[in-house]
Amino acid sequence: MSLSLARFALHSRVFSDVATTGNSNRRLISTRKNRKFSSTASPRAQNKGSEELLVVVGAGAAGVYGAIRAKTLAPNLNVVLIEKARPLAKVKVSGGGRCNVTNGHCVETMMLAENYPRGHKELKGAFFNTHGPVDTMTWFSDHGVELKTEDDGRVFPVSNSSSTIIDCLMSESTRLGVSLQTRKAVITASPTDGGKFLLGIEKRTPSSVEYVEADYLLIASGNGKQGYSLASQLGHSIVDPVPSLFTFKIEDPQLADLSGITFPKVKAKLKIENLQRNIPQLTQVGPVLVTHWGFSGPAILRLSAWGACVLSRTGYKGTLILDFTPDVHIEDVKSILTQHKNKFAKQKVANSYPTEFGLVKRFWKYILGRQGLLGDILWASISKDSLVSVAHMLKHCDFSVKGKSQYKDEFVTAGGVPLSEISLNTMESKIQPRLFFAGEVLNVDGITGGFNFQNAWSGGYIAGTSIGNQAVSAQLDEANSRGQD
């Protein structure tokens, strides 16, 4: 059945008509026949005397999860998801197509919040206490999805397929009667005198606009311009968005020959000129991968997230300092090199090197090349000063960062609606009643490892809970009012 929106203004018009509506938008007049939202699901029978409408902008993780939660609490609430592309598109490609649902090692709120470069202070309150990683894993398990936690804490479906997560969410939203409208985009939003929202919804083909009055509006459109524009129209400010979670381009032609080498544990430090404050998180320890253009891997991605804003101001220029033997003191590195020299004095330096460092031959030759020690040089001819230089190179190898490259498994942005303008215990706007936000449209971003999806699940759940409770309360008030009449 189609959603009953008889008391809402919903009309089709060409986009140019938007500018002529002015403030008289409580009910738009059209010469065309009024049209209702069509539903791709089959909603439960509605209580037409107390119908209210929730429009969710964006059918990503936060939007779908929030819609499900709201509809679960308030079955009589009409819930419509508006998505300009495919629903749950980022879920499909994340984690190499496996979907990194959350992180199972950081379940305590204080520890969990520290994984959010933007939000680590604000999220230490009720946000994750209301719906954290354990709650997320329980929800999916209760809905038939088997999950597994890998050694690094990342949680994936046992199927190793993001389709399992997508099918679960879409099946539940359909079962509840959530309507999904694709190939449409909400392009205008304004409050009405009656406390509702007049939304202009552009259809992708042909180019025309529908208008609808919504009782509740949840903006969960990710890091695209659409959500920022709607938030601005409704009185919110926007922190300028910049990329987060990216790899480093390095100015070193010889590094390309090392592409594919992985270092299991490296201490990586990012130095940025004229940085006015100390950022402890600009030093990270973890795996590092050499790419054709520079460096990637978990340690690099964490650096990029914590340095996202300052790097954007420098044009993504800085110095990357890598310690390839983080568990070995510099004096011990010197000692190991000296012992190796004494033991293998007659062997070529390029062919023989200490196994204690866990290095591969290609990288060892790279280190020697930077010290000018390649060729037929024997260990016996290596001076003490040269050994010290090699030791320092292993512990303090600097690279010039000249730019960034997108990390294809993540599409994360720092910036968005400031958290100071949102009540995090409800996700409701402090500026506009009945307006809610969830997900990456907010100025929240996490490091790699399932943290960005957890932000989406938590925010969507809290927003959906708040909307559902308000809708139920409104229905009870209306029922009581009718009873008194």
Q: What are these model-derived regions, one by one?
A:
Residues 44-62, 80:
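Beta1/beta-strand and adjacent pyrophosphate-binding region of the FAD-binding site
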Residues 182-197:
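A conserved short coil-to-beta-strand element within the FAD-binding core of flavoproteins
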Residues 107-112, 129, 134-138, 142-153, ...:
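Residue-level recognition of phosphate/Mg2+-coordinating polar/acidic sites
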Residues 55-57, 186, 210-224, 231-232, ...:
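Short hydrophobic core segments
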Residues 50-52, 205-216, 283-284:
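Core beta-strand elements of the Rossmann-like FAD/NAD(P) dinucleotide-binding domain
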Residues 216, 220-234, 443-477:
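A conserved FAD-binding loop/helix module that cradles the flavin
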Residues 84, 89-176, 184:
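Conserved N-terminal/central alpha/beta ligand/cofactor-binding core
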Residues 55, 71-96:
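Glycine-rich FAD pyrophosphate-binding loop
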